[in-house]
Amino acid sequence: MKTSMQAKLDQLTTRLAELNDLLSREDITSNIDQYRKLTREHAELQPVVEQYGLWRQTMNDAATAQELLSDASMKDFAEEEIRASRERMETLESELQKMLLPKDPNDDRNIFLEIRAGTGGDESALFAGDLLRMYLRYAERNRWQVEMMSASESDLGGYKEVIVRIAGEAAYSKLKFESGGHRVQRVPATETQGRIHTSACTVAVMPEADEIGEVEINPADLRIDTFRASGAGGQHINKTDSAVRVTHLPTGIVVECQDDRSQHKNKDRALKVLAARIKDKQYHEQHAKEAATRKSLIGSGDRSERIRTYNFPQGRLTDHRINLTLYRLESIMEGDLDELIAALVSEHQAELLASLGDAD
């Protein structure tokens, strides 16, 4: 293990001991905000320090076995013990490296998932509906909560654009690599000649901004229009101006919400989506220079970048960023995304490790 890495782990071990002392103090436990902050830090450090403890114990086992080599009757046992200990130390060190990787501050946030139909007309809108269903099934598997924020349905079903809020543990960390262009190849229901058509949708995954102060929005920068909701009809449709369109004048970002009968609720939802879009725009602008100097294999999350192809005739999904092909499209469209997401996370971790190695 590198000296710098061991020094860092020693610092974390000391800090965990400090936290144990702090969390037992009455003045800390009576301060709810401070107590929560320290408890969160403790929860992050404890598994790292425990892993480091296993590494040190294994190193001590190897040192003890080394001393036995001079004893002829114990030599074979000692050599096997040394070999096993070194293998275990390598595994533990590799795991520790991943645990020390810089944590994305957005990983624990809830998200807004936006799907837009692209090229392909009605078929693209139908595929947008299929993608939404896939993500909703995945959310169910993770016991996340889903709230429809805005939906613009197409004439034949599916969506021209749809935005949902997904709330739950690690939602952003698991879905953040879904941003980009998703291409579908299949025979549309309206195709009489059996020809395969290609269409596309774009997906954007945006971390939800904090309620207070994270994204400053000056009310003077907003234009808020109300209009009558459009939809499939019904007694409440088009009788009141409940739909809301919010335009952020400095950026030109426009958000429409009309799913609720309450204008107030639609406005509140639109402002939440707007804050997430502004935060997302700021994030990508900040990382533009870095992306230009070191092109990430996973990609920047730019929705114009084609990241994946869904080939229905072959039952095949291909993620172009990591050259991964899976021949179980049916289960994937039912929300079985674990293998795919794990592969993307693993590749991202490998990239981070490589970049840290370059920095050393």
UniProtKB/Swiss-Prot annotation:
The protein's role, per its UniProt record: Peptide chain release factor 1 directs the termination of translation in response to the peptide chain termination codons UAG and UAA.
Molecular function via GO: translation release factor activity, codon specific
Modified residues (N5-methylglutamine): Q235
Pfam family, one: RF-1
Organism expressing this protein natively: Paraburkholderia phymatum (strain DSM 17167 / CIP 108236 / LMG 21445 / STM815) (Burkholderia phymatum)
Protein name as it appears in the record: Peptide chain release factor 1
Top-level division of the source organism's lineage: Bacteria
Keywords, comma-separated and alphabetical: Cytoplasm, Methylation, Protein biosynthesis
Lineage: Bacteria, Pseudomonadati, Pseudomonadota, Betaproteobacteria, Burkholderiales
Similarity comment: Belongs to the prokaryotic/mitochondrial release factor family.
Compartments, as annotated in UniProt: Cytoplasm
PTM characteristics: Methylated by PrmC. Methylation increases the termination efficiency of RF1.
InterPro entries: PCRF, Pep_chain_release_fac_I, Pep_chain_release_fac_I_sf, Prokaryotic/Mito_RF, RF-1
SUPFAM superfamilies (alphabetical): Release factor
UniProt GO cellular component terms: cytoplasm
